[in-house]
Structures are given as C-alpha cells and as structure tokens.
Amino acid sequence: MKKIKVNLQPIVKNINLPTVLKTAIMPGDSEESLFIATQVGKIYYISKGAINTFLDIRSQIIELGTSNGGYDERGLIGLAFHPAFYYNGLFYIHYSLAGTQGPGALSKSFNKNSILLSS
C-alpha cells in the first residue's frame, strides 16, 4: 500500500460555531468564494484571500445556550444557493427565529451592493 502524506492548515481564525461550508460564484465575480455560515447567525465569505461578511442576522436568531447546559442545536443551521445564484442572487437559509420554537426564513434576493464588509 502506498503512503500518502497529507498536511492541514487553517484558512480562517476566530470564526466560532461554523455549521455550513459552501462554495459559489457571486453575481458579477469570476472566481468561486468559500462561504462559512455560523450557528450564531453570521455568514462569511472568503474571496481573493479576504474574509468578508455576506449576511448578519444575529439579531433575528434565537439566543443560543440558554438551556440544556449550554448545548444547543438551534440557530443558523442551513445555507443553500439557488442553482442560478450567479444570475438571480437567490439563496436560502434555515434558522431558528428569535421568540419562536420553529424555523424562520428570509425571502430576499442577494444584492451584491448591500454586502457589509467585515473590519
């Protein structure tokens, strides 16, 4: 059996509770970006070596860790891009809405000009 050497190295730091990793090409771009969704409600994307904020819905997410000894399966738990995301900007998220017991959803198209860049 032939041995294969594998090395791992981190690509980001200080992003807590990642729940989803996806790649997609943003409208108007020519390269794929890596998207990282976090359980607390913030989605980042990495493009050309920079980490940016794609969406921040932390204020709309149910407060995590308030029961069950700090363990929680709620929050932002799903992210999917429409097959034609590059053309129509549609994406879908699954999250636990604050003040409810069930999931919530945003029904808005993505607007590249409204991205909040992280500092």
What are these regions (language model features)?
Residues M1-S119:
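Acidic, Gly/Ser/Thr-rich repeat motifs that build Ca2+-stabilized beta-propeller blades
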